[in-house]
Every structure is written in C-alpha cells, then in structure tokens.
Amino acid sequence: MGNTQRESVFEPEFRSDLQYWAKNDRKILLKIFDLIEAVMREPLDGIGKPEPLRHKSTSTWSRRITKEHRIVYKVSAEKINFVQARYNY
C-alpha cells in the first residue's frame, strides 16, 4: 500500500482545526504538517502511533498529535481524507 500516490482531501472540520492551530499553537500546527506528510508517504505506519479506529470503518485511522489531540483520517486506494486534527476521536 505504501508507494501508491493518493489524493489528499481536507474535510471542512479538518480545515477548521488547522485554522484553530494556526491561531493558537503554531508548534502543534507544524507537527500536524509532519503527520500529514507521513500519512501521505505511508498511511498505516510511521510516526504518531497510527492505529485503526475500531468504532469507525476499518479504513479510519488516527495518529497522536499530543497526549490529548489526534489526527483522524480515512484511507482508500485513491485518496486519503483528513477528517479532524483536534481532540480525541
């Protein structure tokens, strides 16, 4: 799955979360950008302790931003939908 080029889609909530971090904590925003790059390279492995979300569809994953906050994304063969970047799922 790793070397497939996928389209990245930022859902409205995810974009809103990025705006929040841009205003409130640029260090976290930069970490989110690092996580986005890692997800695009290898969606199911890498930094941030990737894990599937059991209560969602099998294609929904999360990675740790901080102890409190997670990035949540959905993986398909064609694209990766970034869903949220604040709070826990």
Where are these regions (language model features)?
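Residues that recognize and position ribonucleotide moieties
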Residues: 7-8, 46
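Enriched for short, Lys/Arg-rich terminal
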Residues: 1-7, 15-33, 53-54, 62-70, ...
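A short, surface-exposed loop/turn module that caps and links secondary-structure elements
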Residues: 37-64
